[in-house]
Amino acid sequence: MSVADVKKNAEQKMQKSIEALKTDLAKIRTGRAHTGLLDHVQVDYYGSMVPISQVANVTLVDARTIGVQPWEKKMVQAVEKAIREADLGLNPATMGDIIRVPTPALTEERRKELTKVVKGEGEDAKVAVRNLRRDANEQLKKLVKDKAISEDDERRGGDEVQKLTDKFVAEIDKLVAEKDKEIMTV
């Protein structure tokens, strides 16, 4: 294993932390409707839990309404129940075989709560990135101990890992700021 391997490994894991943050932030509801809001809703489909996208078409009706059309008519009740119980603050209404899910406007208080949640998610991602930096630095120290690299190489590798960490922390800050702005925009 070389310094480049340690750096590449750390970079890949840090990128996964960013992807996880993006996924978590997408679940946080803003004032506008988007189909990703229901991505993690699980529906009881003949005894097994499956994502809503596997049993229904999820579309945007307008800026504040999501339309859900189950492929099987008898799944309408199960899908509606799953959306209601998903703890998203949504209240679906069934019209025939189409479920309309209006997204209520966020109150100022709820917006502030959501920005705290967003900042918390950002902090968790930063902690993950910093832990990956620590792991990479420990790997570099182990390589020096095993005499696979010199101390100068370790120092250079540590500097490169720090630059990576700074880059990913800046990206996390940017994502959090964008989501905050999206939430606070009425």
Curated annotation (Swiss-Prot):
Q: Which organism is it from?
A: Ralstonia pickettii (strain 12J)
Where in or outside the cell it occurs: the entry states:
Cytoplasm
Q: Does the keyword Cell wall biogenesis/degradation apply?
A: no
Q: Which family does it belong to?
A: Belongs to the RRF family.
Q: Which keywords does UniProt give here?
A: Cytoplasm, Protein biosynthesis
Cellular component per GO? cytosol
Gene of this entry: frr
What Pfam families does the record point to? RRF
Care to name a GO molecular-function term for this sequence?
ribosomal large subunit binding
Entries under NCBIfam families matching the protein? frr (TIGR00496)
Name of the protein this chain belongs to: Ribosome-recycling factor
InterPro entries per UniProt: Ribosome_recyc_fac, Ribosome_recyc_fac_dom, RRF_sf
> What is the documented function of this protein?
Responsible for the release of ribosomes from messenger RNA at the termination of protein biosynthesis. May increase the efficiency of translation by recycling ribosomes from one round of translation to another.
**Source organism phylogeny:** Bacteria, Pseudomonadati, Pseudomonadota, Betaproteobacteria, Burkholderiales
Q: Which Gene Ontology terms describe the biological processes this protein takes part in?
A: cytoplasmic translational termination
